[in-house]
């Protein structure tokens, strides 16, 4: 079931829910439902959007995810994480991040340096330094975090170290539901369009029966119907993708709507909240700054 208000949507990828995520018992650890909440494109010092979305995290329990561009530019060079630390950083002990291009030295699109500041700031929560891909369990869900900065991790094709790791990880998974997170979307109606470099990851997840993919990069909110890696509708087996680059940085505008796009907004900061059940999930976009936009619904796992 899907409830959607307003023609376009701006969304922040928000995911909360974390029993046992960090090596110790989490509050609410006995509940059957887990919360996962978050977004991407977060800390931009000239914007107050990140402060507004951080307030949404303040009132939402569970695990926090990010989908890249955590340090989204404009911080002092000697303190690249300073704007993030003052708002979303208040939740760092329950945050599992992935990196984006702005988290790498040199900024957007850079392949001139590593993400030392990113790995130093998030520590073990970001996975092995230099790799940035890892997985964890959240209730009845298997959560996979990937690094879509392909040039920095030895590629993203089927023969790359990350894809070989992903295939092993999925083969060993015994959870009934799977959600994956990374920065660059394979499907998007935003200005940066589709990133074919992540096709192999989508294909591996699809073949393994994954349920949800969450991305950022485009500073918009968009939700797609379940589909195949080729973009064909697949209501019973396809992966539902969310683009939630609404964490606080200045927002983008949409281009032409892509096939299977079901909800879009480019005017609202916010976070995306998942309620993860053992056999399914609910999603709800939480708008910041008093916006009336909303998008919510539910689905079963495959």
Q: What are the roles of these predicted feature ranges?
A:
Residues 58, 76-178, 193, 197-207, ...:
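Extended active-site neighborhood of metal-dependent phosphoesterases/phosphodiesterases
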Residues 10-20:
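Bacterial N-terminal signal peptides
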Residues 16, 26-28:
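Cleavable N-terminal signal peptides
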Residues 2-11:
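Bacterial N-terminal signal peptides that target proteins for export
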Residues 283-293:
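Short, solvent-exposed aromatic-acidic interface loops
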Residues 28-82, 159-160, 168, 188-189:
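N-terminal active-site segment of His-dependent metallophosphoesterases
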Residues 41, 68-69, 100-101, 146, ...:
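Active-site glycine-centered loops adjacent to acidic/histidine catalytic or metal-binding residues
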Residues 36-38, 64-66, 97-98, 180, ...:
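Residue-level marker for buried hydrophobic side chains located in beta-strands
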């Amino acid at each position: 079931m899907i409830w959607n208000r307003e023609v376009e949507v701006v969304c922040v990828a928000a995911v909360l829910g974390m029993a046992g995520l960090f090596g110790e018992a989490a509050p609410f650890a006995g509940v059957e439902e887990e919360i996962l909440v978050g977004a991407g494109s977060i800390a931009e010092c000239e914007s107050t959007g990140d402060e507004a979305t951080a307030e949404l995290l303040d009132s939402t329990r569970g695990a926090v995810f990010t989908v890249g561009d955590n340090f989204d530019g404009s911080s002092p060079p000697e303190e690249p994480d300073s704007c993030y630390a003052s708002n979303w950083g208040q939740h760092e002990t329950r945050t599992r991040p992935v990196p984006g291009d702005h988290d790498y030295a040199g900024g957007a699109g850079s392949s001139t340096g590593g993400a030392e500041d990113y790995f130093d700031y998030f520590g073990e929560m970001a996975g092995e330094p230099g790799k940035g891909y890892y997985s964890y369990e959240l209730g009845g869900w298997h959560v996979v975090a990937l690094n879509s900065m392909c040039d920095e991790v030895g590629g993203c094709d089927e023969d790359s170290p990350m894809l070989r790791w992903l295939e092993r990880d999925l083969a060993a998974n015994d959870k009934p539901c799977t959600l994956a997170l990374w920065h660059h979307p394979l499907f998007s109606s935003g200005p940066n369009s589709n990133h074919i470099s992540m096709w192999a990851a989508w294909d591996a997840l699809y073949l393994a029966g994954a349920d949800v993919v969450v991305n950022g990069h485009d500073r918009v909110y968009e939700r797609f119907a379940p589909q195949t890696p080729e973009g064909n509708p697949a209501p019973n087996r396809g992966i539902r993708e969310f683009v939630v680059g609404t964490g606080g940085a200045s927002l983008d505008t949409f281009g032409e709507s892509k096939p299977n796009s079901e909800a879009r907004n480019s005017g609202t900061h916010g976070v995306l909240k998942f309620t993860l059940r053992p056999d399914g999930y609910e999603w709800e976009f939480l708008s910041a700054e008093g916006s009336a936009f909303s998008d919510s619904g539910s689905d079963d796992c495959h």
